[in-house]
């Protein structure tokens, strides 16, 4: 830390000299304006960027270091999430077709990423999205809407024995991944760029809350996919010679009840977040006890099923319970956020 003494001039003006190395780095000249931002913790931030221009960050990946395209894909996602605005893939030889195909998948799976330049030995990806145009609140609401419909349709597919609906639920998980990665990226940008935080009118602490909730919703989506996948397995089992799903009407009704309980906890937790309501969040946590008791009954029923389908029913009941537990986690995040803001 560079410690400097305050000077008083004219009896009322407080003057602080700037480090020469910093002024030189940012090409500060006499009479140039600089920005002073008061942070939430009372500290002052001095910046040469008075126009609030988004910081440009570049990342170069050499293909010789990433012979595995799956590893390269994960590194591209990491570069995207951590806020790089330009990503360049370079190679000493012609870039293989599988890498180019992977890049196309990457641009389809991310929001705002496009190929800006491309030749035989390099590919440059640019971020064309203005972060301020995608408020975190809107993205969370969209994630909630998609996941809620995934969960409802997964259970409906079980009741209706609808294989195509199962596949539709599974495909929607890609949308959730894209939105979660976007929120993760914006969270990193906000925490590293105070001007963006100011432009989006959101503190780093609030951005962290959005990120935590987004990550939890993404996990709830994974369990909706698990339900849909196991319903598919049940339907395939029924198509086998002499295959028959043996499940009582009572068990179907218990699945429906457990599903409605889990979905109610999810809705309540998200409503408490929108309303910043601690009591609503706490009520969601308390209601988890009833779902846990019903899950215990469902698990026992699944175990006693005398047919190959019992294992799939067990997976489905477990995922319903996990959806309720993750929804309860959202309520805890909401309480932490609300108390922290007081």
Where do the PLM segments sit?
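Cytosolic, long alpha-helical scaffolding segments
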Residues: 2-6, 11-13, 17-342
